[in-house]
Amino acid sequence: MWKASAGHAVSITQDDGGADDWETDPDFVNDVSEKEQRWGAKTVQGSGHQEHINIHKLRENVFQEHQTLKEKELETGPKASHGYGGKFGVEQDRMDKSAVGHEYQSKLSKHCSQVDSVRGFGGKFGVQMDRVDQSAVGFEYQGKTEKHASQKDYSSGFGGKYGVQADRVDKSAVGFDYQGKTEKHESQKDYSKGFGGKYGIDKDKVDKSAVGFEYQGKTEKHESQKDYVKGFGGKFGVQTDRQDKCALGWDHQEKLQLHESQKDYAKGFGGKYGVQKDRMDKNASTFEEVVQVPSAYQKTVPIEAVTSKTSNIRANFENLAKEREQEDRRKAEAERAQRMAQERQEQEEARRKLEEQARAKKQTPPASPSPQPAEDRPPSSPIYEDAAPLKAEPSYGSSEPEPEYSTEAAGLPEASNQQGLAYTSEPVYETTEVPGHYQAEDDTYDGYESDLGITAIALYDYQAAGDDEISFDPDDVITNIEMIDDGWWRGVCKGRYGLFPANYVELRQ
């Protein structure tokens, strides 16, 4: 042990005068009972044995809260008996004055066929007197023509015989019996009567606000001589009749408004947690009114239909079949023209070879000028250019044929039959027969249909779900079908090549 502690100076200092580590109050009294020691300390929050819950008190509280909630709903909720005029009625004070009720029965006007037209404009074949123009005259009116000036008696005029009509005389005019009185001169007037009698004044002309010479004015007292005990309402008071109605007296005691913390906000906007019905907007809806929310579902639009407008979808679907048929016909015509050009080139080469052979064999002219009848031969091909050289055949009637014509004419029968036969003098227009032409077109279409491979007709409409699929409508034609699987095939429709379900189409025989 002494070796382990060698070289170490261990010093332990004891501080007995310091504070206690537990920091216990000097006046602490441990008054914990035996039960509290067993079930936990009461000084520590949440410790100890918890008391059991009182089920009866809990049930009573729940019942009271439920009753209060139901009473509140009945008071604040809408009442079916009150609305638009009481129980199942109409509020008369809100009803439109010009509106009619369900008990109103309007009287329809009669039809023209039901109206009695004998009553109109005044009874039977007459005129309604209340609608007649006051200035209009009836048929019973007889107008009297005014007499001429030479027929009038002017002894009656302007007042009788040689007089004047009194009712037409001017009121301000005087007659010949009027005698005017001349006013007196100033020197003839008696001025003793004027302004109120003899040396007086006219009482009726005196100014009402004027005072006479007998008036004695009383001088107003000085401010020091006035008794101010009566003023503004009596002794040291205020005149009540002259007091401002909005003014407050000295006896008024102003009541201060309560603070926000002192107000009872349980009453506000219609009582306890309610709404004031008299201030509620008539057009506003309450929380009890449930409005059905519209669905936000949108139908899935296919990829191909997105690029086209909705108004043109139907027209596009109707024109797809027509465009497809026109495209097929254009392809068939192009292939037919190509084949005809190849056949035409081959025939020209064969004709040149026959001409060279005919020139080599031609050494002597024919023995007899009379041509032998030509054998009937079928048309080799529908070549329209062969009709041009054959049009000159009717002019062949001379005894010595021309060398160029004979060689050229001799080459045509050798193309079908390797024998030198002469032409007849009859015009041979039947060389380019029409049935052969149509037969060639049918052969061309048969060849084109054979190039389409396996075809099928769509029974239902199908929208492509991916980029490697195709879409089609009912009765659409699908060509070049490859049966890569039992459930999925590959083909061409509407210019697109891709997969499609096999049970949506029907194969064409």
From Swiss-Prot:
Biased composition (Low complexity): 393-406
Record PTM Phosphotyrosine, positions in chain: Y384, Y405, Y429, Y445, Y448
Record note on what altering S381A does: Inhibits actin polymerization
Entries under CDD domains matching the protein: SH3_Cortactin
Keyword Acetylation (UniProt): yes
GO CC entries: actin filament; cell cortex; cell junction; clathrin-coated pit; cortical actin cytoskeleton; cortical cytoskeleton; cytoplasm; dendritic spine
InterPro entries: Cortactin_SH3, Hs1_Cortactin, SH3-like_dom_sf, SH3_domain
Modified sites of kind N6-acetyllysine: 87, 107, 124, 144, 152, 161, 171, 181, 193, 198, 235, 267, 272, 277, 309
Effect caused by changing Y445E: Promotes reorganization of the actin cytoskeleton and cell motility
Compositionally biased residues, Basic and acidic residues: 320-359
Cross-link (Glycyl lysine isopeptide (Lys-Gly) (interchain with G-Cter in SUMO1)): K144, K181, K218
Effect of Y445F: Impairs receptor-mediated endocytosis. Increases the stability of focal adhesion and decreases their turnover
GO terms, biological process: actin cytoskeleton organization; cell migration; cell motility; dendritic spine maintenance; extrinsic apoptotic signaling pathway; focal adhesion assembly; intracellular protein transport; lamellipodium organization
PTM entry text: Acetylated.
Omega-N-methylarginine: residues carrying this PTM: R119
Cortactin repeat ranges, renumbered to this chain: 80-116, 117-153, 154-190, 191-227, 228-264, 265-287
Record's keyword terms, sorted: Acetylation, Cell junction, Cell membrane, Cell projection, Coated pit, Coiled coil, Cytoplasm, Cytoskeleton, Endocytosis, Endoplasmic reticulum, Isopeptide bond, Membrane, Methylation, Phosphoprotein, Repeat, SH3 domain, Synapse, Ubl conjugation
Matching Gene3D superfamilies: SH3 Domains
Entry's localization field: Cytoplasm, Cytoskeleton; Cell projection, Lamellipodium; Cell projection, Ruffle; Cell projection, Dendrite
Expressing tissues: Detected in liver (at protein level).
Outcome (variant: Y429E): Promotes reorganization of the actin cytoskeleton and cell motility
Domain SH3 intervals: 451-509
Subunit (UniProt): Part of a complex composed of NEDD9, AURKA and CTTN; within the complex NEDD9 acts as a scaffold protein and is required for complex formation. Interacts (via N-terminus) with NEDD9. Identified in a complex containing FGFR4, NCAM1, CDH2, PLCG1, FRS2, SRC, SHC1, GAP43 and CTTN. Forms a complex with ABL1 and MYLK. Interacts with SHANK2 and SHANK3 (via its SH3 domain). Interacts with PLXDC2 and SRCIN1. Interacts with SAMSN1 (via SH3 domain). Interacts (via SH3 domain) with ASAP1 (via Pro-rich region). Interacts with FER. Interacts with FGD1. Interacts with ABL2.
Function: Contributes to the organization of the actin cytoskeleton and cell shape. Plays a role in the formation of lamellipodia and in cell migration. Plays a role in the regulation of neuron morphology, axon growth and formation of neuronal growth cones. Through its interaction with CTTNBP2, involved in the regulation of neuronal spine density. Plays a role in focal adhesion assembly and turnover. In complex with ABL1 and MYLK regulates cortical actin-based cytoskeletal rearrangement critical to sphingosine 1-phosphate (S1P)-mediated endothelial cell (EC) barrier enhancement.
PANTHER family named in the record: CORTACTIN AND DREBRIN (PTHR10829), SRC SUBSTRATE CORTACTIN (PTHR10829:SF15)
Name of the protein in its database record: Src substrate cortactin
